[in-house]
Amino acid sequence: TLGNGSGGTAGVATNYSLVGGTYQMTVTQRPVTISGSRFYDSTTTVNGSDISAFTNTAGGQTLSITGSGTVATAIAGSNKTVALGTLTLADGTGSASNYSLASGSFDINSRQVNIAGSRIYDGTTTVNGSDLVITTGVGSEVLTVNGTGSTANANVANNKSVTAGTLALASASGNASNYSMGTITLT
């Protein structure tokens, strides 16, 4: 059945007729974009398991993804463009063959580090950055702490909470901007 066209050059359906026969139509793959995030790990790799969202699927269909891609830098940041590499769509509730992988964006979140340290009793509540040690858990990356914090009292105790005050992460062999401070304890 023909219908009237629209716009400035629209045709009127009654001016045309369809001749019997077989008509063909091409259905193309629907492009989808991906997004996801992970915590800083010093690599530029984006694994399929890091992808959490697919945009532009039809009728709420779901897909999954395998393989890996990359981002330009390993530094923590938002909306990084994903080079698709070997990332491949796989079936979910929708058939992957109906879709094409168009592009992706990715966030690398700063990794939270816990900070611990010890010092000899000195009668004060002040905690110096030099009293503290950070284990990043990322390769051989090392951070230091600058500034001062404080404890609730000067008494000797294990696992005392430290209020951050002016304590701040500083780069040593790791980039401090890839990390955020978690709990700080002093023994």
Task: Go through each PLM region and give its residues.
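Short loop/turn motifs that initiate or flank beta-strands
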Residues: 1-187
